[in-house]
Amino acid sequence: MYVVYLRNPKGDGKAGYYVGMTGLSPEQRFENHKKGRKAARVVTRYGERLVPRLFAHLNPMPYAKAKDMEVALADSLRKRGYVVYGGH
């Protein structure tokens, strides 16, 4: 699991988050996003930094649980009023 802070992806004055899961370390995955490797365009363009306080306590976890947690974490952030990408 990892969460990336996005600098104003919609141009509406609100910042947002990207929620994802990976078999890599969150740092390696973020670096790949920024370099355009298997990347979500929104992270490549607007990703500023990882937000460990939102995911560090969840890692590591098995793949099946991570799939469910990715959706749950994204939904939780949306319910708190954040713009959220990913979390499928």
Language-model-detected regions and their locations in the chain:
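GIY-YIG nuclease catalytic motif and its immediate N-terminal context
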Residues: 1-31, 61-74
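Generic structural motif recognizing short loop/turn segments at the entrances and edges of beta-strands
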Residues: 2, 13-15, 46-52, 80-81
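Active-site or metal-binding loop neighborhoods of secreted/extracellular toxin and effector enzymes
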Residues: 88
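Conserved short loop/helix modules at catalytic or binding sites
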Residues: 23-67
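Short arginine-rich
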Residues: 35-45, 72-85
